[in-house]
Amino acid sequence: MFFLPGVLKNGAVSGIIILRIRSESDDIMVKKVYKHLDKLPKGSASDKLTNGCLVLEGGGWKGLYTVGVLDCLMMNDINFTSVVGCSAGALSAIGYVSGQIGWGARIDLTYRHDPNYCGIGAIKRDGGVTGFTYLFKKIIKDLPLDKKRLCDPSRRLAVSATNLVTGKAEYFEKGKCNLTKAIQASATVPYVSKPVMIKGVPYLDGGCAEKIPFPWSEQSGEKKVMVVRTRELSFRRKPGMPGLAKIMYRKYPNLLESMGKANENFNEMVQMLEEKSENGEIFLIAPSKPVKVKRFDGDMDKLAALYWLGYNDMKERLPQLRAYLEK
């Protein structure tokens, strides 16, 4: 259990909230590192650009599926000109846009049990379960990004975050915002994290309002769109929202309205995406097996297996993706 005093003093309950945010298999006193890090792919992606937009769903540690897909794309010279991500998808997008093969997997499978990255140290420093300060100031020094490529204007990157005042998803694009702050907002898990303030406005995880940031690709007029899901195609969410939301976010009625509709909107969106995929309008990839990884899972073998599932699913479907991009 974690005790979070005053975790949401900006417009929500202060005091003490007790929440379990780790799986039963975790031992927060012991730092665990995946034993087969040396088998993960590594290197730099080619400079080749692929016209189109990559849309990345969130999902906590389920995002390792996305990381596997992205590494396979880079290994095969498929580097989309536009990427939009939500929550874990926003974090995964950094390594892809900067062309760092294996970057996301090495971070998650090395630092998952480091409390500064995920745990008490992160809560103390950043007010939430993910250690963004540790990620952007320490981890990136150990596993550097190609900043020149990341800042290249020919490679668009946008992330979505939920505006607590309007209750709507907003998109922040590289070159037009403080990208690290926007990514932090996009991946700030509700209930266990303080909102991130951007220009005086509080934001939380993009998934609170919109779990798959597909609308950005439509607004941008993209002709070719690839969507990466983090749950199997058959997955649907139950209507409603956690009762805790009505207590913690009672000062934000628009947010509560959005959260109350989010699961139904998600179900409608995934149905629409499947229809567009069947019609050849988009390319959709999702886990070929049911995903057993939980939001805060700490089983390193399960996490690594999900990464390799993403990598191998994408490898198997490369001919279909190339055919879609070429038509």
Task: Locate each region found by the language model.
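Aromatic (phenylalanine/tyrosine) cluster motif
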Residues: F2-F3
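Short, positively charged and aromatic/hydrophobic N-terminal segments
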Residues: K9-A12, I16-R20, D27
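Patatin-like phospholipase
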Residues: E24-C86, I94-K327
